[in-house]
Amino acid sequence: MSGETAYAAIEGSNPLQYVQPTATSALLTRTVDANRELLASLKVSQKHPALKMLKPSSTLEDLAKLGFSDPAVSWRVFQALWTELTATAPAAGLEKDFQPRPPMLVAVDGLAHWMTESAYRSAEFKPIHAHDLAFVHHFLSLLKESDSLKNGGLLLYATSASNNPNPKALNIALDRLAARQAGISASSPEYPQPPAYSDADPRVLDLLQPAEKAVSPVELQTLGGLTREEARGFMEYFARSGLLREIINDQWVSEKWSLSGGGIIGELEKFGRRVRATASASK
């Protein structure tokens, strides 16, 4: 999104999409680091003619590592790995070592940054929309496909009120999702609509829209900060553990609650884990 990694157009893609080889290679590296034992236990079960260097006896760890050494093939490696992880049956001739694939957790933070134009430029020096980056397009497409995780799993996509480009279309799309969950139909006058003459991005508006007469599997959960009472109980945990050497009173809790952006638990935790050390002067 920030325009800091290499990118290139994918030949033959329509509409034109762009791949980010270095970023894809980095994701493959983190995927292996976090799931090495699992990936090493699963054998390749599909045919990947675009990866001629891949041996039929390879594990999924071996497959992912192909994208480490050569970022030029990292996108094809990622696509092959995704095909393997979502496979429900082996390809002909590869039945011997096939094992059922586990459920997957796909987590995306800062979703709002994917709803605007990126810092990348096309050959005509026009801004490239984030949805035209193959990486982004892949993960957003999972929200539209009811069987995107064929072996089960969870899509957890998050955005926040801070560090947010505040795209109008995403706000409307989320309001519409909340309205549908509340039982408000799209034909109701209460159903959220873009302001008149607004330039809300239609691609973003359609992102969370279910197919006609279909029930969307996407669910909206709104999370807020802790109340002052909840924050006090949370901070008392650190005080009783000995990590926090402070007198927990209403004034102190109120101050830290405000400094944490209204009880954001991650910010409160920073205060709780902050160890105060005192040094005595030597005589």
Task: Please tell me what each predicted stretch does.
Residues 83-86, 90, 112, 116-119, ...:
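Alpha-helical repeat scaffolds in large eukaryotic proteins
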Residues 3-8, 114-116, 164-166, 230:
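Eukaryotic short linear interaction motifs
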Residues 90-103:
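Short basic/glycine-enriched coil/helix segment immediately N-terminal to the Walker B
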Residues 1-92:
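P-loop NTPase nucleotide-binding core
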Residues 17, 67-74, 125-132, 220-224:
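Amphipathic alpha-helical protein-protein interaction segments
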Residues 101, 105, 177-182, 206-283:
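C-terminal alpha-helical "lid" subdomain
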Residues 100-101, 112-115, 121-206:
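Sensor-1/coupling segment of RecA-like P-loop NTPase cores
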